[in-house]
């Protein structure tokens, strides 16, 4: 057996849950809308379950969703990834230069007459992904260690740069271009809290799970027994989160369909555009399939939890800015799932004979057609 064969990603045989992921997501979206429209008081009940501006039911779903991917990371390999200056440089430019600039351009192009929605959309573009990217990377057989490192770096930059970038894109750049400006004060602690809760807790759980599991039972047991047992919880947590998000926003989606459409168009262009810009940049810079998948999904996704929290804290829960933040994940989730399948399909074409391509057990044809 060649080394390239040995290093290929070899996920377990596709489970019943994984085989029909698009169907489960569509059903979860529909069920969430149904709950939001049919169960009176549900939105208020869920909205009341908050601590420090964080929705506990949604936080629970995100933590359950993120734990399995972080438990799969081989943390003894992350030091080597962190020293890859080429990978770090490409990711930082895509996340903190290209991403916010593209969202700024799309927001002004599609919402020139809607300053509140436009501001909310720009805030979404500033909130770089630190959560769901772990799921998208895992589904596309990306480099888990690289994704974990990129997410950690995004978290640090989130705390350090969010306020400054908000000031630049809402006040400085519009002023330079002769456009109307927006004044907004972002809470530093809301940003720190979002990072600590939505990344810190599952990251610590993943690290300690691997350390304790390998120490007591060994790596073979941990990776062949324990990880397959907890893997379904990532999808379960994702579906649970989708149901909650759509149930909370059911009224807005139905009562303001035109606003949703106007937000959806630039969001779809943004997610798809960032993904393919990042994929092309990764390919041209010589990265393999797995690292290209990690970089592409890290750059394409956004931290909707932070965008929602900042918009609500700054402009109010019923503001148009907050609506833009809450519509974000409703568009992002189905689009990013579609891009996972696009990555699996394009992988063999863009990266022929790449040793990090998913193995034949996880070939695109099996995933899509089985």
From Swiss-Prot:
UniProt record, GO biological process: response to arsenic-containing substance
Cellular localisation: Cell membrane
Molecular function terms, GO-annotated: antimonite transmembrane transporter activity; antiporter activity; arsenite transmembrane transporter activity
Bilayer-spanning residue ranges: 16-36, 45-65, 92-112, 119-139, 148-168, 188-208, 226-246, 260-280, 304-324, 327-347
Phenotypic consequence of residue 332 to A: Decrease in transport activity
Reported regulation of activity: Inhibited by carbonyl cyanide m-chlorophenylhydrazone (CCCP).
One GO cellular component, as annotated: plasma membrane
Effect of mutating residue 141 to S: Does not affect transport activity
Annotated phenotype, changing residue 241 to A: Does not affect transport activity
Lineage top rank: taxon: Bacteria
Main subcellular location of this protein, as a coarse class: membrane
Extracellular side: 37-44, 113-118, 169-187, 247-259, 325-326
Protein name: Arsenical-resistance protein Acr3
Family indicated by similarity: Belongs to the arsenical resistance-3 (ACR3) (TC 2.A.59) family.
Record topology, Cytoplasmic segments: 1-15, 66-91, 140-147, 209-225, 281-303, 348-370
Function: Catalyzes the proton motive force-dependent arsenite efflux from the cell. Probably functions as an arsenite/H(+) antiporter. Does not transport antimonite.
Topology in the lipid bilayer: Multi-pass membrane protein
Pfam families: SBF (PF01758)
Disulfide bonds: none
Family matches, as Gene3D superfamilies: 1.20.1530.20
InterPro entries in the record: Arsenical-R_Acr3 (IPR004706), BilAc:Na_symport/Acr3 (IPR002657), Na+/solute_symporter_sf (IPR038770)
Entry keyword set: Arsenical resistance, Cell membrane, Membrane, Transmembrane, Transmembrane helix, Transport
